[in-house]
Amino acid sequence: MLRLTQHASLGDRRIVGDMSIRLFYDQWAQYNLRMVEVIGAMSDEHLTVRPAAGRWPIWATVGHTAGARVYWLCAVLGEPGVEDTPFTDPSGAGWEDDLNTPRGADQLVAALQTTWGVVDGCLDRWTPEMLTDTFTREYGDVRRIHTRGSVLQRLFSHDAYHCGELSQTLGVLGLPQIDLWRSD
């Protein structure tokens, strides 16, 4: 049961009770869908285009975007669902780490959809109170503390960042860009 309360000393309104965080990320599913639509329609030739020398081809950027979701949510935070994705290596090695094995549109779409399933589950299960839970990430000799909230913000902005990067490359090629805000 939700109830809206007035906080006496601050004068702000707060929602109290159990609720998921989905409401706060309600457009993220649409962003994923827009990426799936554009990538799914691309040819293998277009997926191998690099925006510049030394940069990843489109397919690797998309694979990296999808793989980051599983790395952070499953490997770092321990969320379920990794087994339903193509990224089952807990070390964090992703498709972008093997540029000699290009991925096609079908593989990329499946990666985006299955990793979205992991994100989607978190949006349903997590409550606002859970966003402050902390987790330790050890990477080599480096040890970092992250909160659920910081990881979710990282992934949301990571998706948007790479959608923008991909859209610039697609625009230069004269291909349809990823329109995150199209409302149809």
Residue ranges of each PLM-predicted region?
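Short, contiguous alpha-helical
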Residues: T5, G11, Y25-I39, E45-G94, ...
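N-terminal leader segment of winged-helix/HTH proteins
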Residues: S20-R22
